[in-house]
């Protein structure tokens, strides 16, 4: 049986739609009353593991899932050995450096050396500031990173930005983008190499559905 790791939350609905195009019905995962974390498809060909977005690449890397859907931001942050198979095109946003709108900073390089930067994505942030040759002190937060500059704990943040409304509502502004992120279909490398064709058939169906969705959108 093929196991697919699906991220609970914002990516789930579109993920289920992509797999539906491959003949895998994960619609039960969308039921708000569902409390099961492992859901087989009605046809019995596959099952879904409902996990946190950040845990998807871990389940795939360790082989507990042959396929998974996860944001590119998570892949960049965790750097686990999974195969990136398809850019699914949904869940788009950007990883950005943001500061208080009143700070006067116009770009990341304007930040003072050794200032504090708060983020859930400390690996991505470290990589970025190292590239600028700007030493900073990274403060890891698990949520509400906007409070860093608001409370004075940090000079800036590195976080995902979709519409920018949360930043604006909290008096912050994005000054530089690190990269753009979308949902990706990933696979367990060894499982892909040993595939009898069943995994590749799913991957190609998902790829075709994603291309069609991109053309329509």
Swiss-Prot record:
One of its GO terms (cellular component) is cytoplasm. The keyword DNA repair does not apply. Keywords: Amino-acid biosynthesis, ATP-binding, Cytoplasm, Glycosyltransferase, Histidine biosynthesis, Nucleotide-binding, Transferase. Its EC number is 2.4.2.17. One of its GO terms (molecular function) is ATP phosphoribosyltransferase activity. Lacks the C-terminal regulatory region which is replaced by HisZ. This is ATP phosphoribosyltransferase. The gene is hisG.
